[in-house]
Amino acid sequence: MSDFDRRKFLKSAGAVAALGGLGVFGPGVNGSAFAQSGSATERNQIIKKTIPSTGEKIPAVGLGSWITFNVGNDIELRDQCADVMSAFFNAGGRMIDSSPMYGSAQDVIGYGLDKLGARDQVFSADKVWTSGDGAAQIAETSDRWNITQFDLLQVHNLLGINKNLPLLFDMKDQGLLRHVGVTTSHGRRTDDLIAVMKNERLDFVQVTYNPVDRKVEDYLLPLAYDRGIAVIINRPFRGGSLVERLAGQPLPEFAKDLQVKSWAQLILKYLIAHPAVTCPIPATTKPAHAMENMAAATGPLPDDKMREQIAAVIGVLV
């Protein structure tokens, strides 16, 4: 990245604040005005981010399924997960992310999509997680989702990447897959992921990022921005522990300028305001929380200065 482009990247939010003097982006990404509830009109006004490699726009908050959707064959729990999916879709969400690593989550997502008749609403994101036969695992994943073409398949935690990444590229070239990605989490193998980003034509990467875990800010996010790679954020709440530790603490005074009602929304706005971030994927078992998370993809976003304030306040409290 050139010095000019790096300065542009790092200062993009701050420039808006300097022009407006408000400390927030307004009215939001793509220049639309945003509301907080879930009517059809407001779903159309949700903040969207662009996938650089294709120009497609997707809602700026998605839905993860790690642990929360691993409920086995319990029909009551499956229906609860379907209720979460319904709330998510009704609030304007699209991307749902899973993995063969997540137990029964893939089956539960497939169950929910069948029950809701929502296959035309979902941006389907899953992973290949094997050092063995990746094609066989992908076929099984497709059966579990009951879906013929995924919007995104990712090499999970770089496992078997020398075999699995070429497999995904071949699928994309044959029209069997729309986007290719690679994931990591917990800050592991960041250097290995960066090497792949430099040498392969990826559509997506997925990494851990939140106001406490900020390692990717130093190099990986600028690299993704420079190379036109979309970025999915896992563990935005540190598996829920970050929000739990903030529970009971009052929101900072400046949060009212962002129209947020919870720490979860403040964290998500911190993330989606970053110019390289495409879509955080918080997981939940509660429909109300799915709606709350999607509401973070509405209204004004923090500028660079306010993002630093958010990180500083949370850093002190946790």
What is the meaning of each model-derived region?
Residues 2-120:
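N-terminal binding-site loop/beta-alpha segment at the start of enzyme catalytic domains
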Residues 12-20, 24-25, 39, 51, ...:
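Structured C-terminal cap/extension of enzyme domains
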Residues 51, 63, 96, 109, ...:
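Conserved, mostly hydrophobic/aromatic
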Residues 57, 89-95, 118, 146-149, ...:
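Short loop/turn motifs at secondary-structure junctions
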Residues 67, 100-102, 128-130, 159, ...:
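Active-site-proximal loop/turn and secondary-structure-junction residues that shape catalytic pockets
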Residues 100, 116-135:
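Structural motif corresponding to the early beta-alpha repeats
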Residues 109-112, 168, 193-196, 290-293:
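Hydrophobic packing residues within well-ordered alpha-helices of enzyme cores
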Residues 129-215, 219, 225-232, 273:
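Glycine/proline-rich, positively charged
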